[in-house]
């Protein structure tokens, strides 16, 4: 087994939230499914998003300089598949309801949370760009259950009925 395949297999065992990252601006509207998203700091609120420079959406995100990270809820598996494949952009966005945040990037109705961001710095790392994104607006939906990607499958999360014992 190659080192690359061993790494991919190991990473499949690292559970992660499923996100649809969207943008809209002078270069047009685009979106993709991502699990390579995480918090950097809360002062100021900053996320990082990893984007492959060979992805068809890369030039749009690069030119727009803004994005929204929409964390998917249980039940969004099909939508994740649309944004993770070769489906045309119009069909991707037609499959759900969207609103606009402060940057104008599409925010998914029913997302667990949406982080509307301005891209502040881009760091190239091998095949990807690491986008450091300043969070300008947060929209939460506390009535949803989470969705994670683990072992190459979706898993719905539910809230516990009671808190953890101390």
Swiss-Prot record:
The UniProt record lists the keyword Plastid: no
A GO term for molecular function: FMN binding
GO BP term (any one): uracil catabolic process
Keywords from the named record: Flavoprotein, FMN, NAD, Oxidoreductase
EC number: 1.5.1.42
UniProt catalytic activity: FMNH2 + NAD(+) = FMN + NADH + 2 H(+)
InterPro entries: Flavin_Rdtase-like_dom, NADH-dep_flavin_reductase, RutF, Split_barrel_FMN-bd
Function: Catalyzes the reduction of FMN to FMNH2 which is used to reduce pyrimidine by RutA via the Rut pathway.
HAMAP family xrefs: RutF
PANTHER family: FLAVIN REDUCTASE, FMN REDUCTASE (NADH) RUTF
Family stated for the protein in its record: Belongs to the non-flavoprotein flavin reductase family. RutF subfamily.
Protein name: FMN reductase (NADH) RutF
Species of provenance: Cronobacter turicensis (strain DSM 18703 / CCUG 55852 / LMG 23827 / z3032)
């Amino acid at each position: 087994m190659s080192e690359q395949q061993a790494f991919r297999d190991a990473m499949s065992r690292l559970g992660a939230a499923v996100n649809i990252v969207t943008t809209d601006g002078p270069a047009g509207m685009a979106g993709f499914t991502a699990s390579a998203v995480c918090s950097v700091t809360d002062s100021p609120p900053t996320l990082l998003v990893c984007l492959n420079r060979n992805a068809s959406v890369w030039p749009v995100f690069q030119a727009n300089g803004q994005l929204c990270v929409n964390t998917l809820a249980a039940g969004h598996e099909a939508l994740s598949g649309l944004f993770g494949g070769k489906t045309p952009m119009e069909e991707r966005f037609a499959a759900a309801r969207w609103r606009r945040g402060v940057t104008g990037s599409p925010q998914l109705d029913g997302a667990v949370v949406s982080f509307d961001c301005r891209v502040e710095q881009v760091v190239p790392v091998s095949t990807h760009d690491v986008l450091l994104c300043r969070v300008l607006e947060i929209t939460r939906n506390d009535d949803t259950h989470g969705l994670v990607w683990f072992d190459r499958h979706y898993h719905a999360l539910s809230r516990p009925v009671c808190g953890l014992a101390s």
